[in-house]
Structures are given as C-alpha cells and as structure tokens.
Amino acid sequence: MHEKYVPSDVESAAQGQWRATDAYKTTETADKPKFYCVSMLPYPSGKLHMGHVRNYTINDVMYRYLRMNGYNTLMPMGWDAFGMPAENAAMANGVPPAKWTYDNIAYMKKQMQSMGLAIDWSREVATCSPDYYKWNQWIFLKMLEKGIAYKKTGTVNWDPVDQTVLANEQVIDGRGWRSGALVEKREIPMYYMRITQYADELLNDLDGLGWPERVKVMQQNWIGKSFGVNFGFPYELDGEQKLLRVFTTRADTIMGVTFCAVAAEHPLATRLAQGRPDLQSFIDECKHGGVAEADMATMEKKGMATGFFVTHPLTQEKVEVWIGNYVLMSYGEGAVMGVPAHDERDFAFVKKYGIPVKQVVAVEGETFSTDAWQESYGDKENGVLINSGKYDGLKYGEAVDAIAADLKALGLGEKQVTWRLRDWGISRQRYWGTPIPIIHCPSCGDVPVPEKDLPVVLPEDLVPDGTGNPLAKSEAFLNCTCPTCGAAAKRETDTMDTFVDSSWYFYRYAAPDAKTMVDARTDYWMPMDQYIGGIEHAILHLLYSRFWAKVCRDLGIVKFGEPAKNLLTQGMVLNETYYRENDAGKKTWYNPADVTVTHDDKGRPVGATLNADGQPVVLGGVEKMSKSKNNGVDPQVLIDQYGADTARLFTMFAAPPEQQLEWSGAGVEGASRFLRRVWAFGQANETALTERAPFDAAKLADTEKTLRREIYSVLKQADFDYQRLQYNTVVSAAMKMLNAIEGAKGASAAVLRETYGVLLRVLYPVVPHVTFQLWRELGYEGEFGSLLDAPWPKVDEKALEQSEIELVLQVNGKVRGAVTVAKDASREAIEAVALAHEMFAKFSEGKPAKKVIVVPGRLVNVVV
C-alpha cells in the first residue's frame, strides 16, 4: 500500500470499485428488514453547498451502518426541478429553463458522486420529466373526480406593468421586483385542494410520529384548531334582511363591540361603495400590496368608516361598519367584530380613528386605561365579565357558553370549530411547472384531459421574458381540440405549485419505472423509516406530503397514511462573516477565505484584514452560510484539497446532527490529520495486520487484555451512539480506539489485526473511502468479505471482564485516591488494602479507623 495517504487516489480507487460492482443498487427482498432513509431532494441551483453535504452525509452514514447490521437499505436521490428560480435564470441568461436545469443537475450529480454517497442512481427522478409529472396530472384528475380538487376565485399579486402574477417573494415593499410598479390584488379563478377536509386527521396523527416536538408544534399551530362562536350582526339593505357574519374565539367580549370591520373584497363593502367614490378609492388602495399573510400582519392598519350600521345581536345597539385593510376575505367570514378594550390590534385601530372603547372584562388587581395597551387587557383566563348585563361576574368559559346559547336561541349564531389551515391553492401563473390538465372549450366549459392523453407535455424550448406566462403565447401548446365535442379549444396555461412535485417523490423512488403512479415496490419501501431535511420545511412541504399520503390512501393508491415514521431536522452550517460599509450604509461582504484574522492570547478574534489590500474589514459575527453574506465554503474546493472523507468526518464530528455546525478551518485540518494517522498506522504495521494468526484470549499479556477491553468498551458506546444518530460521539469513539491501538506497545500481530479491524468498521460509515481501501489492502476482505457488507463487529463480552477493579478511596467522605482490588475481593480484603494505602496514612494523620464503609464496585470510605 502507498506510504502516504493521498485522498484523491484512495477515493478514486474506492469509487471505481463501487461503480464496477453497482454496489448501491438495491432490490426488494423479504429476507431482510428494510430501512428506507431519504434526504429531502435538492433544487438544482447549480452547485452543492455545505448544508447539502451535511444532510447527505448524515443519510449516508445511516445507510452504511444499517446495511452492516443486516438491513436492506435504500438511499435514493432526485431533483426538485421545477420552479421560479429557473425562470429567473432563464431571463437573466437568455436560455430556456430546461437547459439551465438539466445542466445544473448534471454538475450537481457529479459533485454528489465525488462525495462517495451510497445512492442508488437507478432510481433517480427529476420532477420536470414528463414521466414524473404525468402522475401529478393523473392524481389531480382523480382528486377532481372526488371533489378533493376544485376551482374557485383566489387573490393573487398582480404586476400591472409586466402584466403578470407575482409570487409573494417577488413583492418587495408592495412593488414588483422587476418593474417597481405598485402591486395590485386581483381575483382570478384557481384550483385548490381540500386539505381542510383532513385537518382533524393531520392534527391527531402527529402524536404517532417520531418527529421533533418543535416540528409537531409548528404544524399544530399552522393547522390552528380554534373553538369559538360564529354569529351574525343583523342589518337591512336593499329591502332585504341579512346578517354580517363573524367568527370569534372571544365571544365573552361580545358586549364590548364598538365597530365591525370587513375586507375590501367583502360583498357588503362592494355594495356600499356604489355611488361612493371615496369608499371605492379606499377599496382600490387596499387592493394594492402583497397578499402574503406576513405582509398583511406587519403593514400599517388603515380603515374607512362606511356610515352604514348593523345591529348588535344582544343589545340591539347600532354598530358602524368599517372597511379595514387588515381584514382578509380568505380568512373566516371576511369580517371581524371590533373589541378594542380586549384585542391589541383593535385597540391600535380605534386609537388611530377615535372609535369608542368599552371595557367588559376585568382582571383582579389590574387597572384599565385607554392611554396604552396592557397585556392584562387580553387576559381571558383570569378575567371576569363587567359592563355586560346579565353576564356580569362570569368567567371566560361560562360566558362563552351562556352567550353562545343565547345567540343560538335567537337564531343568530352557534358554537363552531374553525381552522387556521386554508385549502391549498395549487394554481401558479408561471411557465416552468406541471401543466394543469384542463381544456377550456367554449361549448363544454372546463374539460379534464382524458387519461389516455396524459401527460400534457410542457414545451421545453420557451424563454420567459417577465411579461406574462410564455405558455399563453405558445400557439403550439395553447391550441387543442375539445375531447368532448371536438371543437377548437384552449389549454389551461396555469401550472401546479411545485409543492405538488415534492409531496410524493419518495413513492416514485421505490418504483421509478412503473407504468402506474406506484406499484407493490412502493408499499414495500414506504413509509420512509427516516426523513432528513431542514426545519424550514416544517410546515408547507411536510404538511402537504402528509395530506398527499392520506389522499392517496383514501383513493386506494397506497396503503399508508403518513409518509415518514421518523424525521431528523439537521442544524444549519454557520461561518464567520466579514464586511465593509460605505458612506451610504451599504455593506460589501467578503468571503472568509479572502480574509486574515488576528487573535488575542486567548484565541479570540480581535481584528481582520482583506488579503487583497491589507485593509481592515469588520467582523460581522457567525451566521448561516449564505450567498447574501458571502460566507459559504465551496464543497468542491474542500473535496479537491482534502478529500471527501475529510469533509464527511468534519461535518459529522463538529456537532450532533440536529444542532448548528460552526465551520472551522482548524477543525478540517484536524480531521485530515486523523485520517492520515489511521492510514499511517495501517501502512507502518502492514505486515502484522495482514497475518491471520489465532490467539488464546486467556494467555494474552496484560497490555493486550487492556487494549481489547478498551476497544470493546468503546465499541459498545459507538454502537449505542450510531443508533441514537449521535455521529459526533461515534467519531470521538474512533479517536479513542486509534489512541489505544497506537499506545499498545508490544501487542501481538493477531490482537492488532483484531482491534484495527474493529476500528475500520466503526469508522467506515463516516469515512467509507479510506476504510474500504485499508480493509482491502490489509486482507480483511478475504476474511470477512467486502466492507460494504461486512458484519458489524460484535462486542466480546469476555474481553470486558476484569480480574481487578478500581475503587474510589475516601477518608471521612472526601476523595483521596483509588485502590485496586481483586474483582471478587471480600469486604475484609478491601478494608485491609484501604488501611494499608499511603493516602490513608497521609490524610488520617495517625488517627485509627473508627469505621470502614464499603460500597461494592464503587468506593471504600474510612472514617477516623
């Protein structure tokens, strides 16, 4: 074997062997338990980043460890290939999104292969392939048949200059990202999926998942089950008696209503604006700005009084209706009751417009003033009703029950369960996505594309220009024949939300060549035993994929109702940031590789200069690696310099998988040094390590017994840590093993071979290349088979047995040293050894022992 460890040579040789034997191709078998571990598929943005490296290495380590333990394991990979970034890149570069996407896939796949990942590439999928998105279209039509998918009007961001719909992230401070025009809200017909139909099940089934509690709580909050009262404020308009309906979780405060507010799109607002230019102008103003919920929550709250009054259902008092820009038509009834004394948003609104405030809940020991909002004003748990007539003195629950009963008796309302969750709007007015399989016929209306005509293929040669959907301008795509009547018709030009693509790709990995959406192989592998991805996907992707599983189950497509038994959300990768700020306050960020840092005598950074000019830069602190902060580390540069195994070892050792990982150049160097030591020991002891001599464990020298005891003791812990996914302590265990082996002077060749073989197997899942090559070159393969399938080492329990044990020695309860005694020593023998120990003589100060306390296996305490 080579004298020096050359990562590029070692990794090239190992990967060549794996390719030649198709080492990671997996088939279904009943002979072994299966384990399906999946990393969230990447968007093909162009290059891998360190977050990818960490995620895929975690998956790879899991795969290799479980394969050694007898599992039929599968690690697939694919590409979340549709989406807006490809359109933006296409506009910037003047190339079709398809070319940009496929070029990126090719490069990123090459990067993954250089990492030595155990991916079964025969199962690769790309969501932009017609073979894949055909099944998006097929199941959409099935959902349409069952009423799970449906069409209704929805609100979107409209850029009046570019004449296009904008995604929420394309609206910046209320303006279009390209044109700078004020964005308008526009109502257009869109397709939705009834995820709300599954709200209860989505909420209840969280209990049975092995997912982080944080993710479960985020989903619980997003689903948002609320218990409240739905009721109406009566009014008369155009000679008709009507109700302005609202939903509230604080029906106890109904006697404190001083106004009602409706959304700009509410039918009542539309009616009241007739003949009222001032109201119409305000409604038009409300329709500017983004529709994202976060934008709505943070924007300035504005309103306009309509001069129209509804009737309070219990007091018969008149309540004025306002139009409010903060009221969403898509939430609840599109109207809210205003109780400024006990709702912080309402409080701020009335302070601005001079609307009265009426306190109806009092908290003992708290005073009430309209000068400023206090947290106690919204306290429902400790409040008692006042100024509420017959409800005075009631607490929250009692008050809600009584008020709901009275509203029901009047025929004006009742208790209701509502959800924060809204149906999933899947229509996107964009080009690069799955075409929605609908044909618009002037005679027949909206006609589903027949199953035999699927897929509706997306043309891949179009280049977006930012002025509307290219599909709407493509005659070849747009023009078609109605499948019902044969008349000339037009295709739907909206495409599906890319979350549709990512809701089920793990089914297709199992059966990538199936002539149906899934087959028996899908039920063999699914649900995933382990899913790995970032916490940022906790709500949308993970919730939609759970919904998808339940729908597919109910449609008889699959047998499972949850996509993943267990979820690991890996921590972010962090790095130092450096910048300079110009006079206008604009920051220019510099990559850490281009900066020299000075440290104080305690190793703390105290200054930094840019290598290019030697001038100072500001230390910006440690933040998530990102393009915006220019603090990323290119994995390819790292692999080219140190090798994939070093990159893998560092990312596994630096932090537990679920915690943040702070990048460290010194840590990378340390990982590289450790692998050189592992190689150097194998090279220096090649002759001894290749001998297959048996040994009698009972006749070993003390140093050999000590070495075996330490190796198997550490192995026990490493095995436990692998099972807990605590790979950082697995690496620590391997380091202890190497230290012990290097320090075992005089150990026989047979014992060195045994213990070094254990080390290689413990390290293999983390650093597969170097261990695979050492295993082959030192002859272990002939004895145990390829390291890919070598059995996980078993702990030799006899090696852990000790003829002597060490007990803590205490004098008057204080630790003064340790004594070594025979494992089966009697109490009398232990006392004798303790009393004869030099530490007893020193700390007893010549006083005789009054009592000796022996705690078997732990300590001996001499009382003087």
From Swiss-Prot:
Query: Can you say what this protein is called?
Result: Leucine--tRNA ligase
Q: Where is this motif: 'KMSKS' region?
A: 624-628
Q: What is its EC number?
A: 6.1.1.4
Quick check: keyword Ligase in the entry? yes
Against SUPFAM superfamilies, the record matches this protein to: Anticodon-binding domain of a subclass of class I aminoacyl-tRNA synthetases, Nucleotidylyl transferase, ValRS/IleRS/LeuRS editing domain
Query: InterPro entries, from UniProt?
Result: aa-tRNA-synth_I_CS, aa-tRNA-synth_Ia, Leu-tRNA-ligase, Leu_tRNA-synth_edit, M/V/L/I-tRNA-synth_anticd-bd, Methionyl/Leucyl_tRNA_Synth, Rossmann-like_a/b/a_fold, tRNAsynth_Ia_anticodon-bd
Enumerate the catalysed reactions.
tRNA(Leu) + L-leucine + ATP = L-leucyl-tRNA(Leu) + AMP + diphosphate
Which keywords annotate this record? Aminoacyl-tRNA synthetase, ATP-binding, Cytoplasm, Ligase, Nucleotide-binding, Protein biosynthesis
Residues bound to ATP are K627
Q: Where in the cell is it found?
A: Cytoplasm
Give the residue ranges of motif 'HIGH' region.
42-52
Q: Which residues form a coiled coil?
A: none
Q: Name one GO cellular component term.
A: cytosol
What's an example of a GO molecular-function annotation for this chain? ATP binding
Pfam families, from UniProt? Anticodon_1, tRNA-synt_1, tRNA-synt_1_2, tRNA-synt_1g
Q: What's any GO biological process attached to this entry? A: leucyl-tRNA aminoacylation
Write out the similarity annotation: Belongs to the class-I aminoacyl-tRNA synthetase family.
* EC top class named in words: ligase
